[in-house]
Amino acid sequence: MKMALDVEKEIAGLKAQAEARPGAKRKLSMVVFSGDLDKHIASMIIATGAAAMGMEVVVFYTFWGTAALRDPSKRVGGKNLVEKMFGMMLPRGRDMTKLSKMNMAGAGTAMIKAVMKKKNVASLGEMFDLAGQLGVKIIICEMSMDLMGFKFEEMIDYPGLSIGGVATFLADAGESAVQLFI
């Protein structure tokens, strides 16, 4: 299981990084900027791995990453033309995200999802469910939501999902032993 070994190596590296900063909390603060499927998968593997190791985990979704948090079943009115255009052009939820490389008009995305299923790797939706169960906190960037015309009411149901700004993230990251940008 090469993927499992890679994840274990990544988690061991995070643990070493956390222990190298005395005074910092056993905490991971992560920015998810990308809207790509593979990067969302990586962020959830790292977040759930760190939470399973007993670390506090906060994930700050900003810019293109915020689209993955949209709930495809929720519709919100009252948007202007630009906001409607962003809504139409960006993925409506995590299941609509695409690979950053080798997407091949969606064939690559379908293949990676099939391989994950065949190898009993949790889907992105299952990873989000696990993250919620493990207490991973998710904060959505308020400015990104405003720029793209997203409303909190159209976001996924996730325990403790909140909105915050860059100051919220920086205060959180300042006390964290590990910070990542994906």
Question: Predicted segment positions?
Answer:
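Glycine-rich, aromatic-bearing surface loops/beta-hairpins
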Residues: I140, M145, E153-I182
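Glycine-rich loop at the start of a catalytic domain that most often binds anionic cofactors/ligands
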Residues: L69-K79
